[in-house]
Amino acid sequence: MGDPAAYRDSTQIVLPVGTLEDIEVDLEAEFMVSVFRPTDAEIVRIIGSPVVIKEVTEFLTRHGVHMP
């Protein structure tokens, strides 16, 4: 069985709160993802399939979002 951390890394992107302010609507309109904001942390999780997460990473890079 695969490493759970590796699978999780391929199905989510974790960013600081506020990173998606200007592009969240476009992100959710263009990709089949869920944007989750835990109440106990200053982060945003973008959750989707591994294929979609790769495409979202490219989208975020094009929009000037620096990946951690």
From Swiss-Prot:
* Family matches, as InterPro entries: VNG_1110C-like
Q: Which Pfam families match?
A: VNG_1110C
Under which name does UniProt file this protein?
A: Protein VNG_1110C
